[in-house]
A protein has these predicted regions:
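Short, flexible micro-motifs
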Residues: 36, 54-56, 84, 93, ...
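Flexible coil segments in periplasmic/lumen-exposed cytochrome c-class electron-transfer proteins
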Residues: 1-28, 89-93, 97-100, 104-172
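Short acidic alpha-helical/loop segments enriched in Asp/Glu that coordinate divalent cations
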Residues: 49, 54-60, 88-91
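Sequence/structural segment immediately N-terminal to covalent heme-attachment motifs in c-type
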Residues: 12, 26-54, 66-80
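Structured segments of extracytoplasmic/periplasmic soluble domains
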Residues: 36-40, 49, 64, 77-81, ...
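Electron-transfer interface patches adjacent to heme c in soluble/periplasmic c-type cytochromes
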Residues: 41, 60-88, 97-115
Length: 172
């Protein structure tokens, strides 16, 4: 029923975000990002309203600082998508075991929409990081425009590494 879904949404908002007090301009960006996140066939489809993902195949966004602290890495993932074995929040995710590729949103979202949804993720789900600005998205979009296809985890880690990523390839 509509009332119970509104109550669930309100409970989720209270529990997961925003994680800091935002000024009026940043709150507007946050709300735009929340709306982009919730669009059909966008982030919410796999990562869920609460950011917990779909275990055991879709990694969580909750308390996920290792993947989202680097602005450029996060923007590249959202623009081009990501495929390959990885560790997120202490768990191993592997395409050989059913983990789908992260969708590439570069052709679907404008710079301001992408910046807003990344800001929403960085300021929700227990994450408390600075916003991503549209000019940063534009810069990374231009730098990666000739790249075709998903980023593999190996390629992304060579450009924007997370310490210890090499061990992910050997985990079972």
């Amino acid at each position: 029923n509509k009332q119970s879904s509104q109550s669930a949404a309100s409970a989720g908002d209270k529990k997961f975000g925003p994680t800091r007090k935002l000024d009026k301009a940043d709150l507007k960006v946050y709300e735009q990002g929340k709306a982009v996140f919730a669009r059909d066939a966008h982030c919410i489809t796999c990562h869920q309203q609460n950011g917990l993902g779909l275990a055991p195949n879709v990694p969580p966004l909750t308390n996920n600082k290792e993947w989202i602290t680097d602005d450029e890495r996060m923007i590249k993932i959202a623009l081009k998508g990501l495929f390959g074995p990885m560790d997120v929040a202490g768990k191993h995710y592997d395409p050989a075991k059913g983990t789908p590729p992260m969708t590439a949103f570069g052709q679907l979202l404008k710079d301001d929409e992408l910046a807003a949804v990344l800001t929403y993720v960085r300021q929700s789900f227990g994450n408390d990081l600075d916003p991503i600005r549209p000019d940063a998205v534009k810069k990374v979009r231009q730098a990666t425009e000739k790249r075709a296809g998903f980023y593999t985890v190996d390629d992304l880690m060579k450009e924007n590494p997370i310490p210890g990523w090499e061990k992910w390839k050997t985990e079972k």
